[in-house]
């Protein structure tokens, strides 16, 4: 491996340590080559998020995301993230269509801020999170793409529950519109931070669905080697613990999401070791 690629991997690992509040704890248990490949996937996903959620005007966001699409189909150039990702794609046969789907998810965030029903939301989650699962499972060495996608969707559903207030500030509501109506919750309730009994019932429903997806997705563990399985179970354990904290607060996420301490996250890693 040449110095340029080594430096690129060093950069994506720094990005992951700095930015990934949960991801870094899972990948720390992987062998070096796999850990660096997953860090490259994370850095790419982070770039998509930073463009879609950043302060650029919509036209420049769209341009930036289309440039990422194009970058996936040509030599990496001098961009450290793309250099590391290109090497990881070669080593682990990370599917290009999953990476393109991730960019499509970022573009969808520019075009849509509401989802009529869960089928529509699931399509979005498949792009922004299921695609990440598909990329990662190539690195883990499993062919269970279906459960990898399901697990990615599960984690995104938990993110949606956790980030309701933050997403509202960005002008987005990911909870399906028909479910808001069914439980008698309005967008005005979200704006007001109204953790009412109706809100609690709605979010209990969201949590139960996320937990069902998580349980199904964890079937992936059966196809993984020990360290890859530990990585995935750590991700899942951290997200499960986050969901439990949110439930314990009565789904009042309007003052910000709960944060797990470093010690708690390390304990979750340790639980997988025994």
Question: Language-model segments: what does each one mean?
Answer:
Residues 1-156, 161, 165-274:
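Catalytic cores of Mg2+-dependent Asp-rich isoprenoid enzymes
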